[in-house]
């Protein structure tokens, strides 16, 4: 068997596998690589950089969608809307820090009432709480 591909004679050629499939990712590694090359971020782009960046983007998207899905379920909805994304991001410390300067259209604000604006406890309820 000199030269040629090893294996059974006459077997069909192995189907090509995308870099996303090789890395076990859903997001497109080839597209991210193309965007890195065309974006003039550097003269040369290594072969591992787009795979790593794609994995990071996929992880962030999955994290945000999971939290937004939980927010939608808490509001008894089956469809994620921008409000659910806003609630998910702003209630998570790390995502809020990462996306602190981002404005989400139709996201609204977090429900928050300042302590001074809440009604004061009456004398009757204050005594009852002290006795307990």
From Swiss-Prot:
Segments crossing the lipid bilayer: none
UniProt cross-references to InterPro entries, sorted A to Z: Histone-fold, Histone_H2A, Histone_H2A/H2B/H3, Histone_H2A_C, Histone_H2A_CS
N6-succinyllysine modifications at: 14, 22
Span of the annotated motif [ST]-Q motif: 129-130
Cross-link (Glycyl lysine isopeptide (Lys-Gly) (interchain with G-Cter in SUMO)): 127
Comment on protein domains: The [ST]-Q motif constitutes a recognition sequence for kinases from the PI3/PI4-kinase family.
Other facts: In contrast to vertebrates and insects, its C-terminus is not monoubiquitinated.
Protein name in UniProt: Histone H2A.2
Native source organism of the sequence: Saccharomyces cerevisiae (strain ATCC 204508 / S288c)
Source organism phylogeny: Eukaryota, Fungi, Dikarya, Ascomycota, Saccharomycotina
Gene: HTA2
């Amino acid at each position: 068997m000199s030269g040629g591909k090893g294996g059974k004679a006459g077997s069909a050629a192995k189907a090509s596998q995308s870099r996303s499939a090789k890395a076990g990712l859903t997001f497109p590694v080839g597209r991210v690589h193309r965007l890195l090359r065309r974006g003039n971020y550097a003269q040369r782009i290594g072969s591992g950089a787009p795979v790593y960046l794609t994995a990071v983007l996929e992880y962030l998207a999955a994290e945000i969608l999971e939290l937004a899905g939980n927010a939608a379920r808490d509001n008894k909805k089956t469809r994620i809307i921008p409000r659910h994304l806003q609630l998910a991001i702003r209630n998570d410390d790390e995502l809020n820090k990462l996306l602190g300067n981002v404005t989400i259209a139709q996201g609204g604000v977090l429900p928050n009432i300042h302590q001074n604006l809440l009604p004061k406890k009456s004398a009757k309820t204050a005594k009852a709480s002290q006795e307990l």
